[in-house]
Every structure is written in C-alpha cells, then in structure tokens.
A protein has these predicted regions:
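Internal catalytic-core helix/loop-beta-alpha segment
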Residues: 76-109
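Short, acidic/polar
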Residues: 1-4, 40-44, 87-94, 142-145
Length: 162
C-alpha cells in the first residue's frame, strides 16, 4: 500500500481553490496514495473521497437538529467515513448521539489559523474521556506530540512544516 510516511488517513482541505482545481488535486492524490482520503466540508467532492469531515457551523447548515443533520449527510455519503469537529465537553456529549465514525477535538495549541482563545490544551484530553467515538486531537499538534487513550489519532496540519 502506498501511504505517505505511514499516514493511514489523509484529509484534503482547500478553502480557496475552484471545484475543478480541487477535483484535479484529489485525482493526483489518489494516484499517489491509497490510504483513507477524507475531504473537509466539501460535499460536492464526496465521489473522490472515502469520507467527509465537517465542522460545527457546516453541520448546522443541514439542520439545527444534529441527529437530523447527520441523517441528511448520511443519505448523501452512505457509509463513507464521517467525522465532526468538536471543541469542548458539551460538543462531545452532543456528538455521542450522532452516527459518526470519529470526532476531531481541538485546538490543542495555538497556530496561525487557531487563536489562543480557542485553545484547550490538556483540558481537551479530559473532555475526550466523554466521547463514545474515536478522538483525533487537532490544532497545533506536531509530529513529536504523543497522546494516550482517550486520544486515538493525532491530526497534524501546519505541524508538518515546522
């Protein structure tokens, strides 16, 4: 299996490219990577991926009733992987009633895209204990960070470039 440095899951995130650019990117990634490919927020790209990661604001665009929102999303993606961003214990408890495959939890540390005001650090690890879903720690996570249960994955973005 071709993976990038033993990376089993890769999330594609491109907030600014055109739909055609994103499709071309995903096709290129598919040629070089056969691990699980997740897209961020872009339902229109689901045919090119193994799953969808969605944020708190984006899920509410489907319905303010999160159970109903996930039902609507599942109608479109079927049993492909579905993940949801969470930031605190309250959102984790909400997510427990949803048909998800994992949650992203963060931000762990400040980054250029996540301000100090949104950072939870070690308190997030305590919050993660309440999740019935596998938890991926996100936001300021580096290759050198290590986590134990209840954290199942570390999600590295800008930390790849340090």
């Amino acid at each position: 299996m071709k993976t990038f440095n033993n990376v089993p899951i890769l999330q594609y995130r491109n907030k600014f490219g055109s739909l055609e650019e994103k499709k071309a990117d995903l096709l290129t990634i598919r040629e070089q990577y056969d691990g699980t490919l997740i897209i961020n927020d872009s339902m229109e790209l689901i045919a090119y991926a193994d799953g969808l990661h969605i944020g708190q604001d984006d899920i509410r665009a489907y319905s303010d009733d999160l159970v109903e929102a996930v039902k609507q999303i599942r109608l479109k993606i079927g049993r492909k992987v579905l993940g949801l961003s969470t930031h605190n214990k309250e959102e984790i408890l909400e997510a427990n009633s949803l048909d998800l495959d994992y949650i992203g939890l963060g931000a762990y540390r400040a980054t250029h895209t996540k301000s100090e005001a949104n950072v939870g650090g070690k308190t997030l690890i305590e919050a993660a204990k309440h999740s019935k879903h596998p938890v991926g720690m996100i936001g300021g996570v580096t290759l050198d960070d290590t986590f134990e249960e209840p954290i199942h994955y570390k999600v590295i973005g800008s930390g790849l470039y340090l």
